[in-house]
Amino acid sequence: MNQIFLTPSQAKRGTLSGMKELRIRRWLGGIFVAAALVAGAQGQGTGTTTSGPSLSTPLYSGASSSIMLSPQSPYSGSVPQGKATADVLPVSFKDAIDRGLRNNLGVLLQSDNEISARGQRWKELSELLPNVTTSTTQSAEQIDLAELGLRFNFPGVPRVVGPIGVFQTGVYLQQTVLSLNSINKVRSASAQQRAARFSYQDARDVVVLATGNAYLETIADAAGVDTATAQVATAQRLFDKTDDQRKAGISPAIDALRAKVELQTRQQQLIAAKNDLAKQKLVLARIIGLPPGQLFELTDKAPYAPLTAMSVDEALKRAYTSRADYLAAEQQVLAAEFTKKSAAAEYYPTIDLAGDYGDAGVNVGNSHGVFQVGATLNIPIFQGGKVHGDVLQADATLKQSRQQLDSLRAQIDSDVRTAMLDLQSAAEQVEVARSSIDLANQTLEQAQDRFNAGVTDNLEVVQAQESVATANANYISSLYAHNLAKVSLARAMGFAEEGVKLYLESNDLSK
């Protein structure tokens, strides 16, 4: 028995009930993916003091039946590698993930942010490390004594002295011996660097989720083309049969008109399905960085396999210890704590050491060793309220970081529970949709038999065809939702990059 498939985007143009159901399913899927990606991107940008592009732009816009990447999101773009070829490039699920991790703009920008954070740490560390310079000068000067205030005329003493040669060379050292302000700045910058490293890993997880969703949706749209093609073929056979009966005087003209309308409706759906597939492939190509104009085909399908998932408590425990955005937020709190200590340390004294050693004289051949060394104790007395203002700002930043961490912890709980609910619901819907397909196909066969036997007109056949289309569309929708829920659960638990590949191999996320 041939199974006819239709994607949710094509089913919306079918019966009203199927359209509403599919719209709700894709709408809910879009909300979850958008929330997961936006939460990840905002976690990367939270409290970051390093320079570089912000990744907190919303990744998905709108809550529609079709999940669309926002053009403003860096995760919707990539840096294409290579040049397009005439050959059709086979792209597997794993290959798409690997390409996205290499070429996606979001992960590349976050990698640059990590380098920027590393540079900021070195800048802060330089305040505690010795600053050593060397210089050599040779000059000649002539001095007017009157310019110096010696306006008296003494016998035998010239009014102008010189030219006098001056030579000096030496090594100069400056060293901060004690500065709690600088020490805590270094500690804060180190925490920021670790946060940037975790944010980079979180960006990779976001890319996996975005790529996985785009790949799965492309599979659904490809199945939609097959569905629409099969529906056109079925409608064509019905029209041919009805038209032959009309010509033979067996069926009325209205039956032929009804069959013709059904055929043209299915043809319109096929045109729309092909267009949707072509556009979705462009979206996928942009995310993973394929060369512009490169033809490719998907080599993996989306089979259904029940997922062996862990309990909610175990999943939450793993998420709190594994999610890179949560670990980054913890480092942001630590950085804010050190920043506050650094601001308070502006009240404390500092000790600096400076010295130099070298040669000085009238020229290189007539010079002698000279040196100078000294220590400076700086004690702040009153700085016009600057330190108080710095402490207030640092304290406010610390409170914000802690609040954002608490909010993210609650969001992780929601993400994990939502993903598990979606996974369970989608699995149940897949089973129901399978049964609906069998029943709809049986109904279509019986309607065709009744029509061929002349018991009824072709209205029953047309209605049965719509039921088959809706049933297969529901199956595709639930299958897409189930596989997306797997990817979303891996993301919610904090190991999307490893978890997606794992579920593809074993359908077990509990390992």
Place the predicted regions along the sequence by residue:
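Small/polar-residue-enriched beta-strand and adjacent coil segments characteristic
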Residues: S92, N131-A203, S311-E314, R318, ...
